[in-house]
Amino acid sequence: MAVAPDGPVGAAFLDEVRMRHPRLRLQAVSARFVLSETHAKKILALSVESDRLGILLANRIETDILMRFALTSQISVAIRDAGIGPSSRDIFILIAMGTARDLVLLHKDLEPLLTEPFASDRAPFLKRKFHITHRAIDATASSAPLEDILVERAAVLGASIRPPPSA
């Protein structure tokens, strides 16, 4: 769900929502880093599968999700770039995992702040931020090449920080 704060919210907002909904796993990602709904679903699938296999990029799945959207293996960089800052007024995507009942309660709680998540085109920002060239997009045989490049880069993050399997 996309949240449009009516004033500066920052990390305190996320902490408050976590206190009101302790059974949910929550992470806020700057809307600029989420290309589309399918991009978000693919990144979440990567994190959930990594959690299942015990190969998260960080100790918590919430942090793993943020790192994959930010395309970095550094937690501090992910928080700085793709997280919500202490006085942020930017729209952010709130990723929530839990039971259907708890998710409905969260939706009701945040309903006045919800907005259209993909109203603006984030492709130019993402191409610039992650140095994705027109040539790379043209070389990708896909109906959504930018999305696939972003997801592929998020998937290989784990390979760059995990030790090789022992023989």
Regions flagged by a language model, labelled:
Residues 21-25, 82, 86, 114:
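Conserved NTP-handling cores and scaffolds of large molecular machines
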